[in-house]
Amino acid sequence: MDDLGTLVSSGQKVAVTWDGSSSKDALKEFVSKLQEAVAPQGTVSVENIERLLLSAHADSSFDAVLLGVVQGTQSVHSSEILAEVARILKPGGAVIIQELVAAGVDKGSPLRTPERLSSLLKLSGLTEATQLLQEPLSPEQKQTVVELLGYKGNDVSTIRMKAKKPNYELGSSRQLSLPKSKITEKSSVDQATVKLWTLSANDMNDENVDLLDSDELLDQEDLKKPVPSSLRASGCGEGSEKKRKACKNCTCGLAEELEAEKTPSTVPKAAPSACGNCYLGDAFRCASCPYLGMPAFKPGEKVLLNPTQLQDA
């Protein structure tokens, strides 16, 4: 039988789990000794591992939780179970977990390696995961593993580990007491330096102060608007033996000049009258007349139409 003095102490509130493979007589004996160990102020709560998530225990309810330590228990504790244990443990509380492990397991195997179990305890919010013991299985226990879990490897053993919940609630926060920053005093200003860089109105009118006139910095040539041809690079578009071609990303205006030469100028032609009565007004104009809507005009008078009116007509 386990040395309960290393698992629990007097006055603690303890939860112990069991499953369908646990020995009923061993469970009763183990719980009885637990109650003696935590008496007179402590209590022992017995939970079926499959119902632990449904028990709805309050946060930080137990000083210690014992998982799989009852003789005959073959449970493999899921990450959800471990997270629930971390929730119901008090800050600083401990969990003792005992389960079957294998040295080398394939993906999809029901068992885990000792390293994987230690990692899951840490991911659940527990710390200081340490191994207490590791024992090989008896032939009868190996046969039970094959029947219950379907694992036929010869590298199965029983491992017991202990982990603790940190001395604070998971997700809790606390304000940091940072040292107050010292207020830097402004350095005194040297009045001699201020006077050196300060110009008064009298200084501006002083004949001894040589001030530059910004208008005198430019001559007449600088003020002339540049001709586009003067902005072109040397040899840009020149030479009768080659076709004029603008540079890539042209900025001198040659590209626009060549584009204008390619596009022929289109001057809209005056629309002729088909009936000769257009000048009389809308009353004498047909429905498709381009002069429809315009005032009457003298015969032979030149009237220019907007290209938009020609398209509408």
From Swiss-Prot:
Q: Where is this region: Fe-S binding site B?
A: 275-289
Q: Name one GO biological process term.
A: negative regulation of apoptotic process
Task: Show the segment(s) annotated as Fe-S binding site A.
Answer: 236-252
The UniProt entry, under Gene3D superfamilies, shows:
Vaccinia Virus protein VP39
This entry carries the following GO cellular component terms, namely: mitochondrial intermembrane space; nucleus
Q: What are the record keywords, sorted?
A: 2Fe-2S, 4Fe-4S, Apoptosis, Cytoplasm, Iron, Iron-sulfur, Metal-binding, Mitochondrion, Nucleus
Q: Name one Pfam family in it.
A: CIAPIN1
Residue numbers covered by motif Cx2C motif 1: 275-278
For region N-terminal SAM-like domain, the annotated ranges are 1-178
Keyword check for ATP-binding, yes or no: no
Which intervals of this chain are the motif Cx2C motif 2? Answer: 286-289
Q: Which domain of life is it from?
A: Eukaryota
Q: Does the keyword Zinc-finger apply?
A: no
Q: Where in the cell is it found?
A: Cytoplasm; Nucleus; Mitochondrion intermembrane space
Query: Which co-factor is required?
Result: [2Fe-2S] cluster; [4Fe-4S] cluster
Residues given in the record as [4Fe-4S] cluster binding sites: C275, C278, C286, C289
Q: Which residues bind [2Fe-2S] cluster?
A: C236, C247, C250, C252
Give the record's family classification. Answer: Belongs to the anamorsin family.
Please state what the annotation says regarding this protein's domains: The twin Cx2C motifs are involved in the recognition by the mitochondrial CHCHD4/MIA40-GFER/ERV1 disulfide relay system. The formation of 2 disulfide bonds in the Cx2C motifs through dithiol/disulfide exchange reactions effectively traps the protein in the mitochondrial intermembrane space. The C-terminal domain binds 2 Fe-S clusters but is otherwise mostly in an intrinsically disordered conformation.
What does this protein's UniProt record list under function?
A: Component of the cytosolic iron-sulfur (Fe-S) protein assembly (CIA) machinery required for the maturation of extramitochondrial Fe-S proteins. Part of an electron transfer chain functioning in an early step of cytosolic Fe-S biogenesis, facilitating the de novo assembly of a [4Fe-4S] cluster on the scaffold complex NUBP1-NUBP2. Electrons are transferred to CIAPIN1 from NADPH via the FAD- and FMN-containing protein NDOR1.
State the oligomer form and interacting partners: Monomer. Interacts with ndor1. Interacts with chchd4.
- Name of the protein in its database record: Anamorsin
